[in-house]
Amino acid sequence: MNRILSLSLLLTPILLATACARASEEAVSSPATATASAVEATAGATIDRELPLAIVHKTASCGCCGVWADHLKAAGFAVEMRDTDDMHPVKQRLGVPAGKASCHTAEIGGYVVEGHIPASDIKRLLKERPTARGLVLPGMPAGSPGMEMPDGHVQPYTVELVLADGSTQPFAQHGPGG
């Protein structure tokens, strides 16, 4: 048992690093092809027409971003993927606070959604419509959508609401004890 735990602890950083590094099958290079890709990619999923389009900005090599987009599609969102070589200007334009970045940034219903945030939290945000910039989940917590672990492990994490002034406050807790 200790051998399995040791091996899991050793391999976890490698799995996390390669999850985001693998090329996404849904990568597109321009908004024109992004729209076509969004239609094709969501053809097998049931799209909830009441939900706004999720525009996901990511680098072309990020695989976990595509897995997170699949999570959104499964929750009823139509998703448009946009690849960019430099995410910093996107995050800056959308108001992601310093130190709160992740690998992808989405625009959903007038809000910024940064990182591997569960679709249920996004739906709650859209229902409650707070005066805020959006939601952030810094880093890439193990077990969050798009970062699922083979053993089902979920690292405790907190999704934060970004207020209009750029400050944050807890919005939702996930994982053991959350």
Question: How would you name each of these model-derived features?
Answer:
Residues 25-49:
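Low-complexity, Pro/Thr/Ser/Glu-rich flexible segments characteristic
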